[in-house]
A protein has these predicted regions:
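OB-fold nucleic-acid-binding modules
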Residues: 1-202
């Protein structure tokens, strides 16, 4: 399920509930590239099945592909970057607009973010980020054109039990200065001439 109402308890839903409601009267919107449906008045929600129908998490090996799994339940084999190990997953002191993002890396050196909002602070603020690797699970949200993972609860973090790995360092891509389009990516430039213009005086 997604977020219904201002908080999960508005409709007394349990994890994995199957619900039905009419989209008539709602309008679609995008919040930092995540699709949402907003209503002028609260829709009537029918709970078709209140048991836990959570599907198995889909394994995604390339974080760049997370954008193709918006709102779906996924898992990624990864580890926290060194600078955040030992911190809490949700730290209100580093929160921005109620959100805390934590950077994780995969074996091939790619990175992605775990995103925690204020609703998850009640459990995420007491769990320490381990110096371990494993499968992180959660639902995919989109922010600024990139896929983030939002763990649903503490059980989505329990796969971090394996030894840390050494990420691969990809070979820089050879290119020209005019072809550099992506910040944070490694490039190798050959046969470049740098011209400086001095505008100061002695």
């Amino acid at each position: 399920k997604g977020f219904l109402g201002d908080k999960d308890t508005d409709y007394h839903l349990t994890r994995g509930s199957i619900v039905s409601f009419d989209l008539k009267g709602g309008f679609s919107k995008s919040y930092y590239d995540t699709y949402q449906v907003q209503f002028e008045a609260d829709p009537d929600i029918e709970i078709l099945d209140a048991s836990d129908n959570t599907p198995e998490a889909i394994e995604v090996s390339d974080p760049a592909k997370l954008i193709d799994y918006q709102s779906q339940y996924v898992k990624v084999y990864s580890q926290p970057i060194e600078s955040i190990r030992g911190e809490k997953y949700y730290d209100p002191q580093v929160a921005s607009s109620g959100y805390v993002n934590r950077v994780f890396e995969t074996k091939n050196g790619s990175t992605f973010q775990l995103s925690f909002n204020s609703y998850s602070s009640s459990w995420a603020n007491s769990i320490e980020i381990p110096a371990k690797a494993g499968y992180i699970k959660g639902c995919v949200s989109i922010n600024q054109g990139a896929g983030n993972i939002s763990p649903r609860n503490a059980s989505d973090l329990e796969g971090m039990t394996e030894d840390l790995f050494t990420p691969e360092t990809p070979d820089p891509e050879k290119t020209t200065i005019s072809q550099i389009t992506e910040a944070g990516r490694q490039y190798e430039i050959e046969s470049a001439t740098v011209v400086a213009t001095y505008t100061g005086g002695f």
